[in-house]
Amino acid sequence: MEAPAPSLTEEDLTEVKKDALENLRVYLCEKIIAERHFDHLRAKKILSREDTEEISCRTSSRKRAGKLLDYLQENPRGLDTLVESIRREKTQSFLIQKITDEVLKLRNIKLEHLKGLKCSSCEPFAAGATNNLSRCNSDESNLSEKQRASTVMYHPEGESSTAPFFSMASSLNLPVLEVGRTENSSFSSATLPRPGDPGAPPLPPDLRLEEGGSCGNSSEMFLPLRSRALSRQ
């Protein structure tokens, strides 16, 4: 949707008319006869009696026209009233076209200036929004690249990450360890009878024979060694 075209305020139009009088000053001073417009300008309250007397004090027609333009520039309705007076005189109608063309030219310049200011005020915002969007996209891509790199570095393919591992250990392994620790403590606290103690079950015959044989063999092994040592002495 197109933005509405800028329009001139009353202050802008007053400035345009003032600039038009200034640009046409030399031309109008040569063409205008100030005394012909006194009556109409005084009737419209643009000039006072003292103003007309001040203008009449000038020695030449060009100076009187210049002083008249000074008063017209000070009044927002000065140029419009001068055009009305020229139209009433019907002797210098070509001045109306000259003044109108100058006003329209300055008006268009003013509009173009306002349009340029409006566009320049919008451009930084749009550029900033685009930069912010691109910056956000680049940040997101950089973050995803970093996450992907960390995943490849610390968690090779086929290996789960550490966070799920510890969460699984805390939820599954810890209860098992606690149960095992409880059972071990119960078994260690209970005292079992040794072989030969009252209440201990009898040994199997094979184990009794092996135990007896080992004792006999041990005595036989040491006695010859002791006798050999004595014989050498």
Curated annotation (Swiss-Prot):
InterPro entries cross-referenced by the UniProt entry: BCL10/E10 (IPR033238), CARD (IPR001315), CARD_BCL10 (IPR042143), DEATH-like_dom_sf (IPR011029)
PTM: Phosphorylated by IKBKB/IKKB.
Annotated segments matching region Disordered: 185-233
Record carries keyword Acetylation: yes
A GO biological-process term: immunoglobulin mediated immune response
One GO location term (cellular component): protein-containing complex
Domain CARD: 13-101
Intracellular or extracellular location(s): Cytoplasm; Membrane raft
Residues with PTM N-acetylmethionine: M1
Keywords per UniProt: Acetylation, Adaptive immunity, Apoptosis, Cytoplasm, Immunity, Innate immunity, Isopeptide bond, Membrane, Phosphoprotein, Tumor suppressor, Ubl conjugation
Biased composition (Pro residues): 195-205
Cross-link (Glycyl lysine isopeptide (Lys-Gly) (interchain with G-Cter in ubiquitin)): K17, K31, K63
GO molecular function, one term: protein kinase B binding
Chief location of this protein within or outside the cell: cytoplasm
Phosphoserine found at: S138
Site (Cleavage): R228, A229
Stated consequence of mutating E50A: Decreased interaction with CARD11
Tissue occurrence: Highly expressed in heart, brain, spleen, lung, liver, skeletal muscle, kidney and testis. Detected in developing brain, olfactory epithelium, tongue, whisker follicles, salivary gland, heart, lung, liver and intestinal epithelia of stage 15 embryos.
Effect ascribed to mutating E54A: Decreased interaction with CARD11
Its job: Plays a key role in both adaptive and innate immune signaling by bridging CARD domain-containing proteins to immune activation. Acts by channeling adaptive and innate immune signaling downstream of CARD domain-containing proteins CARD9, CARD11 and CARD14 to activate NF-kappa-B and MAP kinase p38 (MAPK11, MAPK12, MAPK13 and/or MAPK14) pathways which stimulate expression of genes encoding pro-inflammatory cytokines and chemokines.
Subunit and partners: Homomultimer; homooligomerized following recruitment by CARD domain-containing proteins that form a nucleating helical template that recruits BCL10 via CARD-CARD interaction. Self-associates by CARD-CARD interaction and interacts with other CARD-proteins such as CARD9, CARD10, CARD11 and CARD14. Forms a complex with CARD14 and MALT1; resulting in the formation of a CBM (CARD14-BCL10-MALT1) complex. Forms a complex with CARD11 and MALT1; resulting in the formation of a CBM (CARD11-BCL10-MALT1) complex.
Name of the protein in question: B-cell lymphoma/leukemia 10
Native organism: Mus musculus (Mouse)
